[in-house]
């Protein structure tokens, strides 16, 4: 409800199975239910989605521009849950060791994320590696990111000004045109 009531861009479903109820097939059921309202979904038309949104949230919200285009993303520690590829805009892969393997996920849907939360005082080489990574198939990757990116605000020997490393990685992946 928060996505529609607060006009957010979408939802990030965190999948970290620890033997709890929302693991495996239960998570898949939950995610596909969310996909009725947001994200790509081969099982529903935009008209059907709009009707569901109007029934749940009313005409005022349903009439907002782009209401049927909210994103649905999975945030996970592995490249599992490939059954959810058709229902996902992106897979935020918690590749905290600096890896770049997409597994069964298409490279263009994977956003590789490093752990700045624990490693902010280091050189963050893993983030640079993820920003530089280019898939062998020539397609674009989904991007790169970091857990606790706000810690890059801190100035220290590897970070001479706030967000210096993060801005450098943005330029590596998506260079400015001068």
Where are the model-predicted features located?
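Secreted glycan hydrolases and related glycan-binding modules that recognize and/or cleave
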Residues: 1-178
């Amino acid at each position: 409800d928060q996505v529609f009531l607060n006009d957010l861009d979408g939802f990030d479903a965190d999948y970290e199975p620890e033997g709890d109820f929302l693991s495996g097939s239960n998570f898949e059921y939950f995610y596909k239910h969310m996909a009725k309202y947001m994200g790509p979904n081969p099982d529903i038309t935009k008209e059907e989605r709009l009707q569901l949104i109007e029934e749940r949230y009313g005409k005022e919200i349903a009439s907002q521009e782009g209401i049927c285009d909210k994103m649905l993303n999975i945030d996970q520690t592995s490249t599992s849950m490939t059954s959810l590829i058709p229902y996902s805009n992106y897979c935020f892969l918690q590749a905290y060791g600096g890896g770049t393997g997409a597994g069964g996920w298409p490279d263009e849907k994977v956003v590789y994320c490093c752990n700045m939360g624990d490693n902010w005082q280091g050189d963050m080489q893993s983030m640079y590696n993820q920003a530089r990574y280019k898939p062998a198939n020539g397609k674009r990757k989904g991007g790169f990111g970091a857990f606790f990116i706000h810690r890059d605000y801190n100035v220290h020997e590897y970070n001479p000004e706030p967000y210096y490393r993060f801005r450098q990685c943005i330029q590596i992946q998506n260079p400015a045109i001068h």
